[in-house]
Amino acid sequence: MGIEGVLKEGVVTTSADKLINWARTGSLWPMTFGLACCAVEMMHAGASRYDLDRFGIIFRPSPRQSDVMIVAGTLVNKMAPALRKVYDQMAEPRWVISMGSCANGGGYYHYSYSVVRGCDRIVPVDVYVPGCPPTAEALLYGIIQLQNKIKRTNTIAR
């Protein structure tokens, strides 16, 4: 967990970076941006079988209350400005998970004139979750990968 040592008196020593990153990884608040069938799997991951609450993940309805955006589904050109606007409303630090083949690169509709070929053209993406649609386990693995990425960042040195 980033704890460097425990002394005999019950005192824990750590660095500020590790403490901040530990708190951030244990309290990710994602905002759902469900656009298609991948959103059903995202809701499935939030249900009791997978219990994302045990990881400190609580879905928030507002971008101002969340620090993770999960883009799930086909992003069309008409929806791209709304995605960027919602992303800009999120407080720093913020992360994005791209869920499913359509969000990753256009998916089945890649050659359509109205489809954005990957949400990374609109917002910076931290973790890609493959699949059509990806399972709830795949999303859970992607969230764990995001937690590992957050643990490796230097928060004070930014």
From Swiss-Prot:
Cellular-component GO terms for this entry: plasma membrane; respiratory chain complex I
The protein's enzyme class: translocase
GO MF annotation list: 4 iron, 4 sulfur cluster binding; iron ion binding; NADH dehydrogenase (ubiquinone) activity; NADH:ubiquinone reductase (non-electrogenic) activity; quinone binding
Annotated membrane topology: Peripheral membrane protein
UniProt keyword terms in alphabetical order: 4Fe-4S, Cell inner membrane, Cell membrane, Iron, Iron-sulfur, Membrane, Metal-binding, NAD, Quinone, Translocase, Transport, Ubiquinone
Compartments reported by the entry: Cell inner membrane
Classification via Pfam families: Oxidored_q6 (PF01058)
InterPro entries: NADH_UbQ_OxRdtase-like_20kDa, NADH_UQ_OxRdtase_20Kd_su
Binding site residues for [4Fe-4S] cluster: 37-38, 102, 132
Reaction catalysed by this enzyme: a quinone + NADH + 5 H(+)(in) = a quinol + NAD(+) + 4 H(+)(out)
Cofactor(s) the protein needs: [4Fe-4S] cluster
Residue ranges of the TM segments: none
GO BP terms in the entry: aerobic respiration; electron transport coupled proton transport
Subunit structure: NDH-1 is composed of 14 different subunits. Subunits NuoB, C, D, E, F, and G constitute the peripheral sector of the complex.
UniProt family annotation: Belongs to the complex I 20 kDa subunit family.
Function of the protein: NDH-1 shuttles electrons from NADH, via FMN and iron-sulfur (Fe-S) centers, to quinones in the respiratory chain. Couples the redox reaction to proton translocation (for every two electrons transferred, four hydrogen ions are translocated across the cytoplasmic membrane), and thus conserves the redox energy in a proton gradient.
NCBIfam families, sorted: nuoB_fam, PRK06411.1
Protein name from the UniProt record: NADH-quinone oxidoreductase subunit B
Annotated source species: Hydrogenovibrio crunogenus (strain DSM 25203 / XCL-2)
Species lineage: Bacteria, Pseudomonadati, Pseudomonadota, Gammaproteobacteria, Thiotrichales
